[in-house]
Regions:
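N-terminal membrane insertion elements
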Residues: 1-27
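Heptad-repeat alpha-helical coiled-coil signal-transmission segments
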Residues: 19-22, 26-33, 40, 47
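Metal-dependent catalytic cores of enzymes that make or break cyclic nucleotides
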Residues: 38, 45, 49-238
Length: 238
């Protein structure tokens, strides 16, 4: 009987050792898969990043735009107390929000005079072009709301979906403020950058119509009390 119990104990020990070995093997495989996935994600991000830079390289007046929008969005997100995952979405979403412009003809994208209605309609296609470009890649799922909806307006008069108020994804509402601020404070082929007091007044005026009023309020507070943070971003991505 003692011998039987001893044999059973040995079997249990052997079984336990095998289980541990199997668990270690599974952990190793999972780590290898995780590392490979990270490599693929980095490669994909690098590829799309090159496309993004290609878009900005076409127009010297918008160079650095996406980098600044990314950092302004994160700055707003931090002031709002958002979690790290959402801040990461804002960062990557800001970088790729205009990726769809790669599908817009240079003759329209670089035009120095006023756009015709037809040309403006084509420009308005860039969010959906971006969604089609990134939509099949799982790593971009979280940023698609920014790519698609950063031109929506709080009052429902934006594009492409004419969403109203809280129906607009929160991260897209943040990116909209960041995007507009950078557009107004950047020199363009058809105008100089706007004075900062004019920009501030415009954001305040559009609070509740173009912008989520709470997000606009937070950004106005940054402009009033932490403008050095904005200036650092502008200096970094001249």
């Amino acid at each position: 009987e003692k011998s039987d119990k001893f044999d059973q104990l040995l079997l249990l020990i052997e079984s336990g050792i095998k289980s541990i070995e199997q668990m270690n093997t599974i952990k190793t495989i999972n780590k290898q898969l995780h590392d490979k996935n990270e490599e693929l994600e980095r490669a994909y991000l690098d590829t799309i990043g090159i496309l993004r830079q290609t878009v900005e390289a076409k127009d010297p007046y918008t160079r650095g735009h996406s980098d600044r929008v990314s950092e302004y969005s994160v700055l707003i997100g931090k002031k709002l107390g958002l979690d790290e995952k959402t801040l990461h979405i804002l960062k990557i979403g800001g970088l790729f929000h205009d990726i769809g412009k790669i599908g817009i003809p240079d003759s329209i994208l670089l035009k120095e005079s006023k756009l015709s209605d037809e040309e403006y309609s084509q420009i308005k296609n860039h969010p959906m072009i971006g969604v089609h470009m990134l939509g099949d890649a799982a790593i971009f799922t979280d940023i698609l709301p920014i790519v698609k909806h950063h031109h929506e307006r709080y009052d429902g008069r934006g594009y492409p979906s004419q969403l109203v108020g809280d129906d607009i994804p929160y991260v897209a509402r943040i990116a909209a403020v960041a995007d507009t601020f950078d557009a107004m404070t950047s020199k363009r082929s058809y105008r100089d950058s706007l004075p900062i007091d004019v920009v501030r007044a415009e954001i305040e005026r559009c609070s509740g119509t173009q912008f989520d009023p709470n997000i606009a309020k937070v950004f106005l507070d940054i402009m009033d009390n932490d403008f050095d943070l904005i200036r650092e971003i502008q200096e970094k991505y001249k």
